[in-house]
């Protein structure tokens, strides 16, 4: 059984990833500060003994013994970027630094998520997403 940390785990993608990894028999730690995520998204998971929900801001270092890290923490809309641009930058930059540091310390695999917002708005191409 793997110990897995998911930052931004109470967001849309994060909550679905938490559910999937629990279904596969893993121990899941979900971190979220609820800036854009919601505890409502993970309420069904709270009864699973292999699920732990922690309110935490990834711009502050976090310690855990884990095998894998999925760093999904970041406000997911330009609307939120404008509401609190400093928090957005802190979450993206310090969050990545903190999770990479944790991964190095505990020798964990890490997936660093990004956003379609890094692409050009002028692109005429359609985004194709495959699972």
Question: Where are the regions a protein language model picked out?
Answer:
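N-terminal Rossmann-like NAD(P)+-binding domain of SDR-like oxidoreductases, especially those catalyzing
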Residues: 1-131
């Amino acid at each position: 059984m793997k110990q897995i940390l998911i930052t931004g785990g109470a967001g849309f993608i994060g909550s679905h990833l938490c559910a999937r990894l629990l279904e596969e028999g893993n121990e899941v730690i979900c971190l979220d500060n609820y800036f854009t995520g919601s505890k409502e998204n993970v309420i069904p998971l709270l009864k699973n003994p292999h699920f732990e929900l922690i309110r935490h801001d990834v711009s502050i270092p976090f310690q855990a013994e884990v095998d894998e890290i999925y760093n999904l923490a970041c406000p997911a809309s330009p609307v939120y970027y404008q509401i609190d641009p400093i928090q957005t930058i802190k979450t993206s930059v310090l969050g990545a630094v903190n999770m990479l540091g944790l991964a190095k310390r505990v020798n964990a695999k890490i997936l660093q998520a990004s956003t379609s917002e890094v692409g050009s708005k002028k692109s005429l191409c359609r985004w194709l997403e495959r699972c």
